[in-house]
């Protein structure tokens, strides 16, 4: 069973979101990094670029696959994690900490995100299909 921190929100595309006021930190979940395998490359957008919810904003490449990362909310990139660009293995080692990907600012509260319990049910349902 994946580690699913209860203080975070989640998407069905396996991104996590930590909201703090009008900003949000985004990364991929432990489940996603485990499915991908060893991450070898992370591509993130420039600071200042805006994205709509559901729009791809970067990619994570592993030894098994290349996966797009989707914006869990509409907003502007205010910071990217250059550490993860330089050391992509951080996504595997600490997906909810040092392996975060980007910070967004937003003006409209995000909607459609899953609670930890809802995300756990979702990944269990997906595993049983």
Curated annotation (Swiss-Prot):
<comment type="similarity">
    <text>Belongs to the GcvH family.</text>
</comment>
<dbReference type="InterPro" id="IPR033753">
    <property type="entry name" value="GCV_H/Fam206"/>
</dbReference>
<keyword id="KW-0450">Lipoyl</keyword>
<feature type="modified residue" description="N6-lipoyllysine">
    <location>
        <position position="64"/>
    </location>
</feature>
<dbReference type="GO" id="GO:0005960">
    <property type="term" value="C:glycine cleavage complex"/>
</dbReference>
<feature type="domain" description="Lipoyl-binding">
    <location>
        <begin position="23"/>
        <end position="105"/>
    </location>
</feature>
<dbReference type="GO" id="GO:0019464">
    <property type="term" value="P:glycine decarboxylation via glycine cleavage system"/>
</dbReference>
<dbReference type="InterPro" id="IPR017453">
    <property type="entry name" value="GCV_H_sub"/>
</dbReference>
<dbReference type="InterPro" id="IPR011053">
    <property type="entry name" value="Single_hybrid_motif"/>
</dbReference>
<dbReference type="GO" id="GO:0005829">
    <property type="term" value="C:cytosol"/>
</dbReference>
<protein>
    <recommendedName>
        <fullName>Glycine cleavage system H protein</fullName>
    </recommendedName>
</protein>
<dbReference type="InterPro" id="IPR000089">
    <property type="entry name" value="Biotin_lipoyl"/>
</dbReference>
<comment type="subunit">
    <text>The glycine cleavage system is composed of four proteins: P, T, L and H.</text>
</comment>
<comment type="function">
    <text>The glycine cleavage system catalyzes the degradation of glycine. The H protein shuttles the methylamine group of glycine from the P protein to the T protein.</text>
</comment>
<dbReference type="Pfam" id="PF01597">
    <property type="entry name" value="GCV_H"/>
</dbReference>
<dbReference type="InterPro" id="IPR003016">
    <property type="entry name" value="2-oxoA_DH_lipoyl-BS"/>
</dbReference>
<dbReference type="InterPro" id="IPR002930">
    <property type="entry name" value="GCV_H"/>
</dbReference>
């Amino acid at each position: 069973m994946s580690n699913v921190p209860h203080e975070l929100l989640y998407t069905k595309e396996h991104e996590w979101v930590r909201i703090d006021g009008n900003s949000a930190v985004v990364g991929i979940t432990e489940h996603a990094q485990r499915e991908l395998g060893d991450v070898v490359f992370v591509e993130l957008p420039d600071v200042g670029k805006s994205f709509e919810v559901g729009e791809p904003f970067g990619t994570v490449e592993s030894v098994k696959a290349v996966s797009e990362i989707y914006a869990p909310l509409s907003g502007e990139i205010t910071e990217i994690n250059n550490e993860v660009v330089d050391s992509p293995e951080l996504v595997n080692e600490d997906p909810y900490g040092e392996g975060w990907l980007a910070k967004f600012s937003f003006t409209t509260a995000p909607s459609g995100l899953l609670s930890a319990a809802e995300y756990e049910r979702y990944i269990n349902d997906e595993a049983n299909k």
